[in-house]
A protein has these predicted regions:
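Short, solvent-exposed aromatic-acidic interface loops
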Residues: 78-82, 117-123
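Hydrophobic ligand-binding cavity/cleft-lining segments
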Residues: 1-39
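A conserved amphipathic terminal alpha-helix motif
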Residues: 94-97, 119-147
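Charge-dense, helix-prone N-terminal extensions
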Residues: 8, 50-53, 59, 63, ...
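Hydrophobic-ligand binding "helix-grip"
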Residues: 33, 38-43, 58-109
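Hydrophobic pocket/interface hotspot
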Residues: 17-21, 27, 50, 64, ...
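Short structured motifs
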Residues: 3-4, 47, 99-102
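A generic structural signal for beta-strand entry/edge sites
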Residues: 1, 49, 70-72, 109-113
Length: 147
């Protein structure tokens, strides 16, 4: 497992950036650089369930390990969902189960420093770098557009 980190300064409040990251209307706009038709469904509870899926409903089953809106959220990835079936036990899943994805938003007088850390398998590094570079640039664009 490898941990990648990303940082971007956004000229908007943490509340605004949080809304862009997790809002129903904007989540799939910035995550399209990872997968077309990306969706996130969550009960927003620590220890609850969060699903990160593609347009076919396939993707990851995760939980929120820590949340302090609008300053921090940490997702723990637990398994996969494919064809409606959740998988927590296959060898593929065991290779990365327990990996974390962290978002930290720090307020500097109305500007936000967004820091992201994600645990990945090395073979996904290029995909993650491309996705986060383009995705976080889109978050910045969306957050600053209406400020």
């Amino acid at each position: 497992m490898k941990t990648l980190s990303y940082n971007i300064k956004i000229y908007a409040t943490p509340e605004r950036v949080w809304d862009i990251l997790w809002g129903n209307e904007t989540y799939n706009v910035w995550t399209k650089f990872f997968s077309c038709d990306s969706q996130m469904k969550s009960d927003w509870k620590v220890g609850g369930k969060t699903y990160f899926t593609d347009g076919d409903g396939n993707g990851m089953v995760s939980t929120i390990e820590r949340i302090d809106e609008p300053n921090e959220i940490v997702f723990k990835h637990l398994g996969m969902i494919k064809d409606g079936q959740e998988d927590f036990d296959s060898e593929d899943v065991k290779a990365w189960a327990g990996s974390l994805e962290k978002y930290l938003l720090v307020d500097y007088n109305g500007e936000t420093q967004l820091h992201v850390e994600v645990d990945i398998q090395p073979e996904y590094e290029e995909m993650m770098n491309n996705g986060f570079d383009q995705g976080l640039a889109m978050v910045k664009h969306l957050a600053e557009k209406l400020v």
